C-alpha cells in the first residue's frame, strides 16, 4: 500500500546522552555512520520507501549539521510543493522544553492538528535498519491497535532503558517492563511506534495535563490493560546505537557481507545527501583489506578492517586497523591506529601510536591535532 494517509515523525535528539562523545556538537540523527551516511538516513529512508510523503523532524539542540545534511529533503524526494519535509525546532527557550518525547510532541501540537493524515509513525534516530514500514502500518491497521510497538527478539542493550514486552498469540501486549538490559531472549522495543493521530493527540494532552513526561511509562506502561497495545516483531537486521561501543560495533558489522546485504536492499534503498567527489586514490605502496573506503580519499599507507569516510588521507607508512576515520581525517606517516574513532578534520601527526579495544575504542574530538 502507499501510505499517503500516514505522517512520519522523527525524534532527532532522543538518546543524545548515550553517545555524548559524538552528540556534543550535533544531534544524534546527524551522527556519521558507515562511511557516507548519517543515522537519520535509515528511518527517513524507511518512511520514504513506504510511501510516506509528509515527515516532521523534531529537533531540540545542535541541529545545524542535521539541517545542512537534510536540506530541503531533495535526496529523499521530499522537496515538494505540497507536504514533504518539515523541521520542527523548539518554540520556546526554557530548559524544561523537549526533555522527553511527550514534551516534544506537546510542542508540535499545532503541526499535528493541521495534518490531515490519519496515522502517525514515530521513530527515534538510533535505529540502524532497513525496516518495511509498509508492513508495519498494515499490521497496525489490521489489528485495530491503539498503539503498535515494534520490537526485536534477543538480548536488549544493557546500557539503556528498554521496553520489554510479553505478548499473546495474536500479538496483543499482555505485560510490559521498563528496565536497563534484560534476559538474553527478550522482546525489546526499538523506539518505533504506530498510532492513530487522534489517539496520539489525546494521549499527549492527557499526559501533559497530569504532568507526566515519559511516553513509555505514562502512555504505554500505564495503559497495558485498558488500551489495545500490540507488538510487531521486526525480522530485518537492526542495530540499536545506545553507546560509543555499540556505535563502533555497528560500524564494524558493515564489513560483514551478510549484514550489508540485509541493510542495503535494492528494493528499499537507503538515501543520503549526495556529494560529488573523485574516487579514492590508492598509492603504489597502499595496502587495503576488508575495509569500506569512501570517495575523495587518498590512501598511501595500510588500512585493514576499517570504515573510512570521505576525504580521508592516510600517508605512506601509516597503519590503520579496526578504525572509524570520519571526513577530513589526516593520518600522517608512520603512525599506527587500532580501535580508534576520529571525528571530522582530525590530524594524527607523524609517528603516533593510538591503541584502544573494541569494547573501549579511543575517541578523538572534531578538529583535534594529536
Where are the predicted features?
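Unchanged
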Residues: 1-253, 364
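Left-handed beta-helix
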Residues: 1-12, 198, 206-370
